[in-house]
UniProtKB/Swiss-Prot annotation:
This is Protein YhgF. The keyword Cell wall biogenesis/degradation does not apply. Gene3D superfamilies: Nucleic acid-binding proteins, RuvA domain 2-like, Tex N-terminal region-like, Tex RuvX-like domain-like, YqgF/RNase H-like domain. One of its GO terms (molecular function) is tRNA binding. Keywords: RNA-binding. The gene is yhgF. The keyword DNA-binding does not apply. Transmembrane segments: none annotated. InterPro entries: HHH_9, NA-bd_OB-fold, Ribos_protein_bS1-like, RNaseH-like_sf, RuvA_2-like, S1_domain, S1_Tex, Tex-like_central_region. Residues 651-720 form the S1 motif domain. Residues 721-773 are annotated as: Disordered. GO terms for cellular component: cytosol. It holds the Pfam family HHH_9. It comes from Escherichia coli (strain K12). GO terms for biological process: nucleobase-containing compound metabolic process; response to ionizing radiation; translation.
């Protein structure tokens, strides 16, 4: 069951109605997959798409964890005999894990603290006396509480003990913590300084050696860069609660917040100085340390979430890149001393030939003859060249082959080889090619990923594809969960050929486990090709529920029923039968008949189970059966004579392929072995909030070279072709830093966060985001 308040919360967050959320949760709890629900249960969910469902799934998990923790806390406090009606009401009302833990803090079992020791020593009456009645002189009052046998040796020890009691009491006040937390989040700065003596060793973090910026607005890439610097022992991070002052003040404004909350008024009474000291201790020793850790954790969590989302978007774009299709392809895995590895696959992706050539070590003529012979023998239409070391040299070699052998007409394409080496050494590659040398397997992968990027890349751990922003600095569990969802959604959006798909590809189909995928391939090997979807039920361990989830995403071309090659689910075949009866046409005549299908009204074919959304989808599918949602295949043409960074000149206009998109811009491969950066401010003449709205991985773009830094291996590019090299770095058309409103401007202290212009001298994260070779 789903809590009604949870339904309302999630509905507001995903722009849906509570009843839609409730219906989706029921479907998920029944074991239905997100791709299945999104495509085949639109009537029940009101048309929630896969993105909404994924967000719902994530938020639902959080809220259920919250509820489980809430019940555990209520039980714990109740067993202590301290659960009041007001406390129970507050605990039941909160929807934040942080607030929940704040409420539990005073009752949470903990090690003996100094405050507890002081209470055991009988000092609580002293603490209450001095706090409530400041007319008492602290030293005089404390003299009555000196108990040497209890560890209270003198009045100073008694007063310190009383301070600890009050400090711990106030630091566990949930309402007080909420006020200070809110102030810090809105006003504090995150401060980064270099650890003394680490300047040279940590040079890549030098932009953060003396840096501060508002805590709540620090971009994810800068936050993760600073956290990485701290983890490597180069940077120290802290919070400045009072950034409006040049130097840290003697008293923080947070101390005033604490005093106001506690109703403390100072009137020069004998105990006022001591009480002021209690407030100072509460802030500096307890609250600041607690909230600094917590808020930095919040910043890191937000930064990690953004980084994971960036990775997910880039992975989605890479997986959904245009396939070259059923064309015989040669894969060239470039190398210098070790040679260029060659693999030829036929139109179906089957490996038909391999070789190793040495065009860069004095054997170019022999290598050219080998390539030409393979191209002619196997009717090669495309040549995929890996983009790693010696890529441009290998590309130039192939162009020479075409000049020498006019019959070699296969189009060359530079292909990202990220992850190819990981695949080569994997258990899966060993199973596919047990007798093939590891070094040649990479060439096979390069060829196949040009034919069908999705089918080949699913064989590789997404984290090895290298299109992520600080992917090694984030929660690997959350990253894996997110990326698995992306792969699943992409595979099911495209659909899978049941008779040719590999085990890794089948494993990503909704409802199928790895064991089921293996059993499908085993059944196929033993019985030949599937002729209809119903034969899936003959596969071991694939029962009715799994069939329901997977059948619509599995295609059978040239089988018994043309509908088996479409996205129409077998459960909806009766709807098609009604359409055929109404149009008095045979299925093969109706499929693709746009003029006939566009005259149909979806509402004429609905029933209790299938409403207008599903029938509309069926009619669209009949019009264009088996349509591929991926774009048309296009390639970037790198400029002749531009092969290394030394060949680049400011002002050059080049064509390139977007390899990676981050929150601060896009990296573009222009064929010089080092991706250039188009900063967010140079993506468009209009303001750009999110680079992903302008470009995506795989896009072919025209760029102008603005700056080349050979020493740091930085290339600054712009997609605003009217932008001139050397122009000011001030933001003109975009960027993601906005003015701070509703708060006094902080005076500079050290280096403030600067709007990073489109300079090759970006901070260290440009290196981290560079192409993985």
């Amino acid at each position: 069951m789903m809590n009604d308040s949870f339904c309302r919360i999630i509905a507001g967050e995903i722009q849906a109605r509570p009843e839609q959320v409730d219906a989706a949760v029921r479907l998920l709890d029944e074991g239905n997959t997100v791709p299945f629900i999104a495509r085949y249960r639109k009537e029940i969910t009101g048309g929630l798409d896969d993105t909404q469902l994924r967000n719902l799934e994530t938020r639902l998990s959080y809220l259920r964890e919250l509820e489980e923790r809430r019940q555990a806390i209520l039980k714990s406090i109740s067993e202590q005999g301290k659960l009041t009606d007001d406390l129970a009401k507050a605990i039941n009302a909160t929807l934040s894990k942080t607030e929940l833990e704040d409420l539990y803090l005073p009752y949470k079992p903990k090690r003996r603290t100094r405050g507890q020791i002081a209470i055991e020593a009988g000092l609580e009456p002293l603490a209450d006396l001095l706090w409530s009645d400041p007319s008492h002189t602290p030293e005089v009052a404390a003299a009555q509480y000196v108990y040497a046998d209890k560890g209270v040796a003198d009045t100073k020890a008694a007063l310190d003990g009383a301070r600890y009691i009050l400090m711990e009491r106030f630091a566990e006040d949930a309402a007080l913590l909420a006020k200070v937390r809110d102030y810090l989040w809105k006003n504090a700065h995150l401060v980064s300084t270099v650890v003394s003596g680490k300047e040279e060793e940590g040079a890549k973090f030098r932009d953060y050696f003396d840096h501060h910026e508002p805590l709540s607005t620090v971009p994810s890439h800068r936050a993760l860069a600073m956290f990485r610097g701290r983890n490597e022992g180069v940077l120290q991070l802290s919070l400045n609660a009072d950034p409006q002052f040049d130097e840290p003040p003697k008293e923080s404004y947070c101390e005033q917040i604490i005093m106001d909350h506690l109703g403390l008024r100072l009137n020069n009474a004998p105990a006022d100085s001591w009480r002021k000291g209690v407030v100072s201790w509460t802030w500096r020793i307890k609250v600041l340390m607690h909230l600094e850790t917590e808020l930095m954790g919040t910043v890191r969590e937000r930064a990690e979430d953004e980084a994971i989302n960036v990775f997910a978007r880039n992975l989605h774009d890479l997986l959904m890149a245009a396939p070259a299709g059923l064309r015989a392809t040669m894969g060239l895995d470039p190398g210098l001393r070790t040679g260029v590895k060659v693999a030829v696959v036929d139109a179906t992706g089957k490996l038909v030939a391999t070789d190793t050539i040495y065009p860069h070590t004095g054997q170019a003529a022999k290598a050219a003859m080998t390539v030409a012979a393979l191209c002619e023998k196997h009717n090669v239409e495309l040549v995929a060249i890996g983009n790693g070391t010696a890529s441009r040299e290998t590309e130039r070699f192939y162009l020479d082959v075409q000049k020498q052998f006019p019959k070699v007409t296969a189009q060359k394409v530079i292909v990202s080889e990220a992850g190819a080496s990981v695949y080569s050494a994997s258990e899966l590659a060993a199973q596919e090619f047990p007798d093939l040398d590891v070094s040649l397997r990479g060439a096979v992968s390069i060829a196949r990923r040009l034919q069908d990027p999705l089918a080949e890349l699913v064989k590789i751990d997404p984290k090895s594809i290298g299109v992520g922003q600080y992917q090694h600095d984030v929660s690997q569990t959350q990253l894996a969960r997110k990326l698995d969802a992306v792969v699943e959604d992409c595979v099911n959006a495209v659909g899978v050929d049941l008779n040719t798909a590999s085990v890794p590809l089948l494993t990503r189909v909704a409802g199928l486990t790895r064991m089921m995928a293996q059993n499908i391939v085993a059944w196929r090997d033993e019985n030949g090709q599937f002729q209809n979807r119903q034969q899936l039920l003959k596969v071991s361990r694939l029962g009715p529920k799994a069939f329901e989830q997977c059948a619509g995403f599995l295609r059978i071309n040239h089988g018994d029923n043309p509908l088996d090659a479409s996205t129409v689910h077998p459960e909806a075949y009766p709807v098609v039968e009604r359409i055929l009866a109404a149009t008095q046409q045979a299925l093969k005549d109706l499929m693709g008949n746009s003029s006939e299908l566009r005259n149909l009204k979806a509402s004429d074919f609905t029933d209790e189970k299938f409403g207008v959304p599903t029938v509309t989808d069926i009619i669209k599918e009949l019009e264009k059966p088996g349509r591929d949602p991926r774009p048309e295949f296009k390639t970037a043409q790198f400029a002749d004579g531009v092969e290394t960074m030394n060949d680049l000149q400011p002002g050059m206009i080049l064509e390139g392929a977007v390899t990676n998109v981050t929150n601060f811009g896009a990296f573009v491969d222009i064929g010089v072995h080092q991706d250039g950066l188009v900063h967010i401010s140079s993506l468009s003449n209009k303001f750009v909030e999110d680079p992903h709205t302008v470009v995506k991985a795989g896009d072919i773009v025209k760029v102008k070279v603005l700056e080349v830094d050979l020493q740091r291996k930085r290339i600054a590019l712009t997609m605003r072709l009217d932008e001139q090299p050397g122009e000011t770095n001030a933001r003109r058309g975009g960027g993601n830093e906005r003015p701070q409103n509703n708060r006094p401007a902080a005076k500079p202290r050290g280096r403030e966060a600067q709007p990073a212009g489109n300079s090759a001298m970006m901070d260290a994260l440009a290196a981290a985001m560079g192409k993985k070779r």
